[in-house]
């Protein structure tokens, strides 16, 4: 799967050619497709045509009817071939056809037993290969279902039925989505829309659904936009245009209308789809880049909010019209699969050479041509590991499915290989290393000697004007809202203290009756704790807002005066409320509020006092927020106008205008919040460090806060001359990539950073040769996630843009899941090495046994059917079970694997040759001994060299038992079964595979029907005991190797502990 591919929704990245020299045509032509048609209709006309509502959408019953009628919202795909046809295609392999030709020749020459035996054996081999390929395809299909895409929508559901929806396929809308004023400026209608919003699988969308989308979302279907706020959409995967396109709800009525709303792009990039009409004949439709009121399926929202009506799903979308060309593009194979292909090819050449030598020697010795031909082809089938690439794919896919059950969804198979090479993990602090539930623990304002505990000093918090002002600002400059359950049954302020911020002991998750940004929720939880009511519904309307961003590091709102009903932010009595990072707030304040409520000039000594109080809280690992308020200065700029307290702005102002309005404020105080570390994160960090993986924490918090939290997590924070354990965003701005690459070797914390700094950190680490994993959740994190070797997006809080760029998604947003994923990545690679060892040692042993027997002039010890049976064991369940061996818990003590490391290492080749030699030597010894177990009647005292069915049965069974013991030794390269390091029955699939193989072998030698096919005869208990003693030698020899290696490792480290700890 390619880097740009997505499991559930393939995106087409058109290759942009050189820019066009002419301006885009914006005139409206005669429409012939749904998007073209609806782009000319207004929102009301669109709703009327699709028989839906602009406020409430469809009813669930109507949506169900349309889903049954139109089918799921999925891109068209080719129907798979019937299983019987795919099974017959397995017979197209050259070696299989040669074996069938051998069977046909035997039949015509009267050797009916051989003909039937070869045909049956070939059928068994083909069946095993077919089952393997089928499992591989099903495993890959399961991967595509790991990342289901969702859509936020409004459906007309009565309040009594809402809980039923939540228990089925819907859930409460995420806290980061603002809906008010998108469809109506009425606060009541917006509130109703919020309560009715739901999250459903994108595949369940139908035409007429009312869909909501915001920054970072992927558009789930073709949508006619009915309301938008600062909405821009990235359509590069559809049109090739690199710049996000501004979107508007107005209909394209004429050429003039189209021009007036088009983005200011003089010469957009060209692509096969950019100038193409919407799924119609050239020149007949409105081009895709002109449809500024259509959001196309698969495109990504870069900024703003939007609402619209679904007009096309599945094959009826613009993506659906080009999906046929996508189906013809095969996903590239992973590097490991390509290396297995090359290995198989090289081994094929060697095998053909050895087989040709065997056939030539046999013919020179006067053996029958048909016999040597059949043996040669059978050896080719057994010796050439044609199943190796398939088993690699199955192992990777099954490993990914196991990782998904543990909370890590790998979106691309090559990423599994890279996981074992990761030696640096860059992690966000909030939500990944911590619980992402802030709780206010301390507060400070002037005239306080030091920050006080809010829960221990309730009188200070509720009696003083300064403390009450801090709470008031935190309440007003706040976008958190009641959760759907709390909104439908609101609690009083007195009872909210009991309901707010409870802990679910079963899951460890912290619950609140509020939803929104963690800092906003923490402040409202504090209000609940002290029984204070939410004031936002009782004060004047919010007339403007400056939203928080990682670059700005503060947010502010402007509340209109009671006398000013018009939504203007220039009223004489408007008041600004601001909260954010200390330095950003402090620079906007001229005065401060004393404990008794007086305003005093904020001079430099008092600013220093504020900074000391903030540093005191930050040193305890608290996140510090500053609060201020004051009258709005009269400016001439524009503003963001709102209809209610949590509305989304309808227009935007310049950065300068925003700064001018939030100046000359009164500083109120500080609040310290605590986001506790996740459970066992400190253990995960220690285990990663023990395995040679550095952990770097990236946070927007202050330096002292970051250091305090890092120490709690057990991260190395050592400040020594010439090195700095912490770098800030300002330090990064001043450093070049080369300087950062040099300094980063001693740095484990980056504080006061923005998403843009992540890209610089990744480049610096990669320039040193590090393999980097980077976490992120926002739109601005996407470039760094894509640049990193392993981009890790958050499953709960991450945007669709971040998930699109990532290689791995954490469904629980937990750092410990990264450790489990790296463990699995390492384990999968070593498991692949183990079954390669098993397959190659079996293949080499079979070839060398037949070659040596031929050179010594013996009759072939194994007939064609027996060789094909060995091939089934080599490529079948025993080999596959080695690929799913449980991961060794001590695997993290091994250093990360080099990206250029070969699969076939020197120790692996030595294991292959040792095991193959033991198998060949022991099997040949049994064969020679059994040939001489009877007297030669013509020469008294001389042993007979006549090969009987008993001789070949003993040889055949000896080889199979050798194979089983060899598979047992290949379960681990270093762990011993005898010393109890490797549980004998720890791999259930391996147990079943061995039992099945032994049962099959018993059938071959004891069931009369199979005796005739494989030319065997029954063995007694004494024979089996002798074979067990001989065949177990490969196990004892490998156990001895493991013991000697363990002794060497203990001597190397002195006391038996890993040198990395």
Curated annotation (Swiss-Prot):
Deletion: any effect? Leads to osmotically suppressible basal growth defects and cationic tolerance associated with increased expression of calcineurin pathway genes. Results in hypersensitivity to cell wall inhibitors but does not affect virulence. Leads to severe polarity defect, hypersensitivity to ER stress, and attenuated virulence; when srcA is also deleted.
What are the boundaries of the region Disordered? 1-40
- Give the transmembrane region(s): 91-109, 115-131, 344-364, 381-401, 838-858, 912-932, 946-968, 990-1010
Where, in residue ranges, is this chain on the Cytoplasmic side?
1-90, 132-343, 402-837, 933-945, 1011-1061
Supply the SMART domains for this chain. Answer: Cation_ATPase_N
Any idea which positions bind Ca(2+) 1? 381-382, 384, 386, 871, 875
Q: Does the keyword Transmembrane helix apply?
A: yes
Biased composition annotated in UniProt, kind: Low complexity: 30-39
Query: What SUPFAM superfamilies does its record include?
Result: Calcium ATPase, transduction domain A, Calcium ATPase, transmembrane domain M, HAD-like, Metal cation-transporting ATPase, ATP-binding domain N
This one is known as Calcium-transporting ATPase pmrA
